[in-house]
């Protein structure tokens, strides 16, 4: 590797990782409430320790969620079905401490209620709904993969997803739910990926498994198929370092081995460290929370900019004040990769094409639906196994037209 080249890494985790277990429980509860009342206001956190879960937060909804049942259903779907794997969904403890959302917060978010909202015009609704909190959010896109995601995090997610697939299908026996992946890619001085350097997989397994057997099976059934799918002939991967369970056995996993908490994998959830992060987590939050909806909207904006060929990569920063509809600021950073246009022209086109008020985002991306559980593992962006509305590139022509009209 030359001095101008650099190594960039990103990690992912499987759905059985204790933090991801908590994310999925929080989003399963959110989905259940949105399915009954699309205007539900939800902010639900989950924490996990050995044999016990605490679900807490604030909810205002016409719906009702049986939290105990939802926790156990989620755990069963992940694969925590017996004490042998470290957790039994049917016998673990579940403590619920959910209260109603603060009226002071609600008054800034929902100024129109009932008949007022029904009678209001779209513009009146968009102006009436302020941001659910202050904060800064980021969205990112790059043309180094077909999904317009950074290669390290995209590859790490694909490995984690396929690791779970072969566990659930039985293609590789003796695997248990907890697991992590990590990928290191070499980039050249033009910031292009040129070589796979390292693949790391740590996976929970049954006691009778040897590490040598596991390394062979994972290479055959997980690593090789994913590398062929994602890298193909585009990025050399014939001389990389493979690490499987580098500390040795990994029998005890999940919440039995480590405490879990909603919102503790925010870099895994987004861009693997390739972009900035405002710090706000996603899971358990309804779309009135701009931590979530604005992060989705900025990904949508960034992806359309790159898909339109205006820049090779772009990061969008947006900021809000609680109770105020219009963003405090919107910044476009193209890292010097803009193509035939200036950064200022792109920023002006974004302001013309995208309405980034919270209610407008919710309407445009149709976010008042039970779509969030599927986001809670393997990344919120750049997915190929499920379609999310913020991944659409429906504003490409409008952006080009806005640029041409300047």
Curated annotation (Swiss-Prot):
Residue numbers spanned by region Flexible loop: 101-111
Keywords, comma-separated and alphabetical: ATP-binding, Cytoplasm, Magnesium, Metal-binding, Nucleotide-binding, One-carbon metabolism, Potassium, Transferase
Residues annotated as binding ATP are: 17, 178-180, 258, 264-265, 281, 285
Task: Look up the record and name the pathway of this protein.
Answer: Amino-acid biosynthesis; S-adenosyl-L-methionine biosynthesis; S-adenosyl-L-methionine from L-methionine: step 1/1
Q: Which cofactor does it need?
A: Mg(2+); K(+)
Q: Could you state one GO cellular component term attached to this entry?
A: cytoplasm
| Subunit relationships | Homotetramer; dimer of dimers.
Role, per record: Catalyzes the formation of S-adenosylmethionine (AdoMet) from methionine and ATP. The overall synthetic reaction is composed of two sequential steps, AdoMet formation and the subsequent tripolyphosphate hydrolysis which occurs prior to release of AdoMet from the enzyme.
Protein name from the UniProt record = S-adenosylmethionine synthase
């Amino acid at each position: 590797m030359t001095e101008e080249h650099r190594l960039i890494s990103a990690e992912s985790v499987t759905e059985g990782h204790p933090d991801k277990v908590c994310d999925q429980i929080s989003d399963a509860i959110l989905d259940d409430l949105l399915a009954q009342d699309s205007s539900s206001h939800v902010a639900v956190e989950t924490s996990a320790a050995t044999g016990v879960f605490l679900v807490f937060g604030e909810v205002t909804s016409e719906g009702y969620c049986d939290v105990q049942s939802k926790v156990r259903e989620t755990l069963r779907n992940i694969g925590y079905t017996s004490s042998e794997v470290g957790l039994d969904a049917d016998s673990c403890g579940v403590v619920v401490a959910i209260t109603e959302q603060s009226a002071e917060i609600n008054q800034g978010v929902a100024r129109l209620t009932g008949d007022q909202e029904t009678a209001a015009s779209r513009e009146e609704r968009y102006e009436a709904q302020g941001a659910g909190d202050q904060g800064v959010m980021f969205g990112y896109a790059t043309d180094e993969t077909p999904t317009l995601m950074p290669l390290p995090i995209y590859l790490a997610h694909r490995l984690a997803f396929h690791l779970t697939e072969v566990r659930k299908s039985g293609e590789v026996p003796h695997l248990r739910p907890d697991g992590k992946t990590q990928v290191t890619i070499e980039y050249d001085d033009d910031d292009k990926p040129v070589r796979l350097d390292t693949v790391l997989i740590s996976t929970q397994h049954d006691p009778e498994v040897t590490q040598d057997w596991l390394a062979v099976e994972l290479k055959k059934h997980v690593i090789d198929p994913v590398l062929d799918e994602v890298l193909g002939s585009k990025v050399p991967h014939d001389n990389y370092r493979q690490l499987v369970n580098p500390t040795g056995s990994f029998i005890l996993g999940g919440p039995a081995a480590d405490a879990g908490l909603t919102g503790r994998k925010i870099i895994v959830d987004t861009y693997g460290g390739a972009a900035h992060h405002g710090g706000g987590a996603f899971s358990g939050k309804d779309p009135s929370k701009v931590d979530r909806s604005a992060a989705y909207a900025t990904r949508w904006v960034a992806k359309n900019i790159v898909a339109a060929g205006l820049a090779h990569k772009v990061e969008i920063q947006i900021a809000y004040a609680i109770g105020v509809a219009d963003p405090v600021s919107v910044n476009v950073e193209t890292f010097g990769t803009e193509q035939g246009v200036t950064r200022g022209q792109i920023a002006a086109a974004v302001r013309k094409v995208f309405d980034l008020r919270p209610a407008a985002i919710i309407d445009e991306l149709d976010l008042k639906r039970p779509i969030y559980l599927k986001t809670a593992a393997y990344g919120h962006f750049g997915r190929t196994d499920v379609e999310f509305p913020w991944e659409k590139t429906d504003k490409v022509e409008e952006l080009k037209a806005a640029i041409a009209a300047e």
